[in-house]
Amino acid sequence: AHSRVVTNDVKTILGEEGLQQYCLEPFLNAESGTTQLDWREGPAESLDKDVVSSCESPFSAEGGLKLLTGNLGRSVIKISAVKPEHRVIKAPAIIFDHQNDLKMRFDAGELEKDFVAVVRFQGPKANGMPELHQLTPVLGLLQDRGFQVALVTDGRMSGASGKVPAAIHLSPEALNQGAILKVQEGDPIELNADKGILHNHAEGFTERAMPPVADRPSVGMGREMFAHFRESVGAAEEGASIF
């Protein structure tokens, strides 16, 4: 409530005093003779700085969200839960056009190695950016087995940060002729969260012709209803808005 970026002029369930009331803590007031519930000023500093730190002593000097750029485009990565030894990886690309494909190849025993999973056609224009939650358990298990793995996708992953480095919201997306569409199996992909780099080191990658995009289903399962939104939606880095 003391922050310069919080609006205090609000009415809450605690009364007319705005958010200031949320800085109070409840306690049993024995001095009243009835041990009634009362309120007092809460602690000014964190009681457990391993959980909540201060501005003067932050967990990270730069925060947990970083921008990655390179010849694949622009993406963001959450590194709060990624150990330093996993923040830099250079490994061959394996291409997936659906998150289920990764699980199938894992079950078939084809992913017991270092690789960068490149998951395409998951952007706002392609399919509305669904949550790619199925990727995390598989990649996390492979990392636990000692393999260097990472994710690059034009899709999204919401929620808490994972332990696997994941370059998400890559723009431009594959359906918008983004560079991710030109990535081929085995291309050496570098993801460097420390330096903010996302780069395909394959020789001649930038000059590669853009491959054709296969026709995607446009009717059935309500697709007709949302066709206008798919056509007009903006890029992920611009908010994926239709306005």
Residue ranges and their predicted role:
Residues 1-148, 152-173, 178-243:
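Catalytic or ion-coupling anion/metal-binding cores of large enzyme and transporter domains
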